[in-house]
Amino acid sequence: MATIAITPDQNVIEAEIFVAAPRERVFQALTDPTQTPRWWGQKGMYRVTRSEADFRPGGKYFSEGEGVDGKKFRVEGEYLEIDPPRLIVQTWVPSFSNITGTVVRWELESRPVHGLQTTGPNRMGTGTLVKLRHTGFANNRPSAEDHARGWQRVLGWMQAFVEKGETADTREPLSA
């Protein structure tokens, strides 16, 4: 499970999760627009249904999806900095929130993993510490709290996809 915190000034969300897979694989899950709709979401909640990305500094991206209530949403922005497979910095403009001007920074650090099998998708014996930093909430505590809950779910979904192949379609539905 991801660890997550909101800074005392309520401006920054910081989260971390360990993924038992090489950072190249984690980077791919985060940046490949054909993979994002496979893992970003859960039945009974919301899910991304379409993503597109011009993956370069200055390039634009968007993800569209639908909530359990049928309401559509969209997140879009621009890539500010990219250093594969270590770093992604992007603006974050969601249709479902009143925040503007926020920035998401993803840092991926390779870490050794002891006791893993030497065959299968993680045969390299390395894992990835994913650090997420979402800035720009400007004392908007309700939005920061909402996004913190969302990032906790998203990081868990990504971890389950990369480690176990779990998708939004195969994941256990959220109970009402």
Please give the residue ranges for each predicted region.
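Hydrophobic ligand-binding cavity/cleft-lining segments
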Residues: 1-46, 176
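Beta-strand/loop substructures that line and gate deep hydrophobic ligand-binding cavities in soluble
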Residues: 12, 16, 89-152
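Short beta-edge strand/loop motif at the mouth of beta-sheet-based domains
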Residues: 14, 34-72, 171-176
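Non-transmembrane alpha-helical segments in soluble domains
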Residues: 27, 37, 152-155, 159
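Short coil-to-beta-strand transition motifs
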Residues: 71-75, 100-101
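A generic structural motif
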Residues: 82-83, 112
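Short, highly charged C-terminal tails/helix-capping segments
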Residues: 160-176
